[in-house]
Curated annotation (Swiss-Prot):
GO biological process: glycine biosynthetic process from serine; tetrahydrofolate interconversion
Binding residues annotated for (6S)-5,6,7,8-tetrahydrofolate, in chain numbering: 117, 121-123, 349-351
Organism field: Citrifermentans bemidjiense (strain ATCC BAA-1014 / DSM 16622 / JCM 12645 / Bem) (Geobacter bemidjiensis)
Feature type site, description Plays an important role in substrate specificity: 225
Keywords: Amino-acid biosynthesis, Cytoplasm, One-carbon metabolism, Pyridoxal phosphate, Transferase
GO molecular function: glycine hydroxymethyltransferase activity; pyridoxal phosphate binding
Names of the cofactor(s): pyridoxal 5'-phosphate
Official protein name in the record: Serine hydroxymethyltransferase
Residue numbers bearing the N6-(pyridoxal phosphate)lysine modification: 226
Protein family membership: Belongs to the SHMT family.
Gene behind the chain: glyA
PANTHER family: SERINE HYDROXYMETHYLTRANSFERASE (PTHR11680:SF50)
PROSITE patterns named in the record: SHMT
Record pathway: One-carbon metabolism; tetrahydrofolate interconversion; Amino-acid biosynthesis; glycine biosynthesis; glycine from L-serine: step 1/1
Location of the protein in the cell: Cytoplasm
C-alpha cells in the first residue's frame, strides 16, 4: 500500500480510477495528451516545496541555487527548440501567458484584432466573457463561409479600418495551416504588434511539421501540454527588445512565485522534444489525424474545411439530427472521449453546439497508428448512428477497451 492509499484512500481511489480511464478509454480531446514517466517524476518532485519569486540569479528568496539551474535548463532548451531570442517559462497556464503579453503591449481600451471564438479562436483572443474582451476593444476576424479557412483578405480589411495595436493569431479549433507571414504583412501595414498563440500546434512547430511563427511575431505564447506533451503550463517567447517588459509583466505583474516542479517538468519535456523520436511521434500525430479524417469522411461525416493539416478535426453535425452535446455524451458512454464544439457560423448554443472536436495526440502517445485510426472511425460511426442504443454503445466500449489494452501506457500504475 502506498503512503497516499494509507492516509487518504478516497483521493487514492480517484487517482486509480482516472488512471484506469486514461489507460483503457480512447482519449480524442484535441487539447489533451499523456506525459512521459520522466515528466511525471519531475512534476511530483520535492521542487514543489520551493518558493522562488523572481528570476534565476535575481530571486527574492534564498536557497534558490538548485531551482535556478532547472529554470535555466528549461529556458535554454526552449530557445534551442524554437529558435527564440528570449523565453519565459514561468506562466502557470496559456491564458496567463496571453495575459502577460496583453499587459506588456496594451493599455485598457486599446484595439486588438483576434480570431472569433465561434470560428475556432480562444477565450483569451477577445471573448466578451474573458479579461481580453472586457479590458480591450476587440475586433474579431474569422473564416470564410465558403472555404471555412481564415479569410486573410477580410482580416486585412478589418486591420486597415480599425488600426489595431496588436493582432492575435492562433486558434483552439482550426484544422488548417496558419499563414503567419500573411499576418505579419497585415500587421506591418498598420504598425501592429503580432502575438501568436501556438498552444495547439507547438509540438508540430517544434518538429518542423507546421511553419514556425517565431520569425514573424514579436511574441509567441504556448501551453506546454497538448502536442508538446509536457506538463500543464504556459510559456512565452519574444524578441529581445521586449524581454524586460515581458518579464516584469509575469512577475510581479500577474504572478508571484513560479511553480518550480512544473518548470522542471517543462525542462524534461523540452529535452524530449529535441530528440529524433519526438519528430517521428509528431509525424505520426499528423498521419493519424489524416487517416481518421479520411475514415470519417468515407463513412459520410462532414468535416469543416473538408479535412485537416494538423492534429485535429471538427466534425460538422449541423445537417444531422445530432447535436455536439448528444454526440459527446454518447461517445463517452462508449469509452471514447471528445468534446462538443461549435462550428463556424453555428446557430446552436455553445452548450449544445453543432459539432465535435477530435484530436490524435493522446491516442498517438499510446502508440495507435493509421490502421487503428480506421478502427476508431468505425467505432465513432457506430456510436453516432446508435446514440440511444445502450447495448450497442456497451459493445463498442468493450471493443475500445480491448484495443487500448494492446497499447498500454500507465498500466504499471494500476498494479
Amino acid at each position: 500500500m502506498s503512503v497516499l492509499e494509507t492516509f487518504d484512500p478516497a483521493v487514492a481511489e480517484v487517482i486509480r480510477q482516472e488512471t484506469e480511464r486514461q489507460e483503457y478509454n480512447l482519449e480524442l480531446i484535441a487539447s489533451e495528451n499523456f506525459v512521459s514517466p520522466a515528466v511525471l517524476e519531475a512534476q511530483g518532485s520535492v521542487l514543489t516545496n520551493k518558493y522562488a519569486e523572481g528570476y534565476p540569479g535575481k530571486r527574492y528568496y534564498g536557497g534558490c541555487h538548485c531551482v535556478d539551474v532547472v529554470e535555466n535548463l528549461a529556458i535554454d532548451r526552449a530557445k534551442e527548440l524554437f529558435g527564440a531570442d528570449h523565453v519565459n517559462v514561468q506562466p502557470h497556464s496559456g491564458s496567463q501567458a496571453n495575459m502577460a503579453v496583453y499587459f506588456s503591449v496594451l493599455k485598457p481600451g486599446d484595439t486588438v484584432l483576434g480570431m472569433n471564438l465561434a470560428h475556432g479562436g480562444h477565450l483569451t483572443h477577445g471573448s466578451p466573457v474573458n479579461f481580453s474582451g472586457k479590458l480591450f476593444n476587440i475586433v474579431p476576424y474569422g473564416v470564410s463561409k465558403e472555404t471555412q479557412t481564415i479569410d486573410y483578405e477580410e482580416t486585412e480589411r478589418l486591420a486597415l479600418e480599425h488600426k489595431p495595436k496588436m493582432i492575435v493569431v492562433g486558434a483552439s479549433a482550426y484544422p488548417r495551416i496558419i499563414d503567419f507571414e500573411a499576418f505579419r504583412r497585415i500587421a506591418d501595414k498598420v504598425g501592429a504588434v503580432v502575438m501568436v498563440d501556438m498552444a495547439h500546434i507547438a509540438g508540430l512547430v517544434a518538429a518542423g511539421l507546421h511553419p514556425s511563427p517565431v520569425p514573424y511575431a514579436e511574441f509567441v505564447t504556448t501551453t506546454t501540454h497538448k502536442t508538446l506533451r509536457g506538463p500543464r503550463g504556459g510559456m512565452i517567447m519574444c524578441r529581445e527588445d521586449w524581454a524586460k517588459t515581458l518579464n516584469s509583466n509575469i512577475f510581479p505583474g500577474i504572478q508571484g512565485g513560479p511553480l518550480m516542479h512544473v518548470i522542471a517538468a517543462k525542462a524534461v519535456a523540452f529535452k524530449e522534444a529535441l530528440t529524433p523520436e519526438f519528430k517521428q511521434y509528431q509525424g505520426q500525430i499528423v498521419k493519424n489525424a489524416k487517416a481518421l479524417a479520411e475514415g470519417l469522411t468515407k463513412r459520410g461525416f462532414k468535416l469543416t474545411s473538408g479535412g485537416t493539416d494538423n492534429h485535429l478535426m471538427l466534425v460538422d453535425l449541423s445537417q444531422t439530427e445530432l447535436t455536439g452535446k448528444v454526440a459527446e455524451e454518447a461517445l463517452d458512454r462508449a469509452g471514447i472521449t471528445v468534446n462538443k464544439n461549435g462550428i463556424p457560423f453555428d446557430t446552436r448554443s455553445p452548450f449544445i453546439t453543432s459539432g465535435i472536436r477530435i484530436g490524435t495526440p493522446a491516442a498517438t502517445s499510446h502508440g495507435l497508428k493509421e490502421a487503428e485510426m480506421e478502427q476508431v472511425a468505425g467505432f465513432i460511426a457506430e456510436v453516432l448512428g446508435n446514440v440511444s442504443d445502450e447495448a450497442k454503445l456497451a459493445a463498442v466500449k468493450t471493443q475500445v477497451n480491448a484495443l487500448m489494452k494492446r497499447f498500454p501506457m500507465y498500466a504499471n500504475r494500476l498494479v
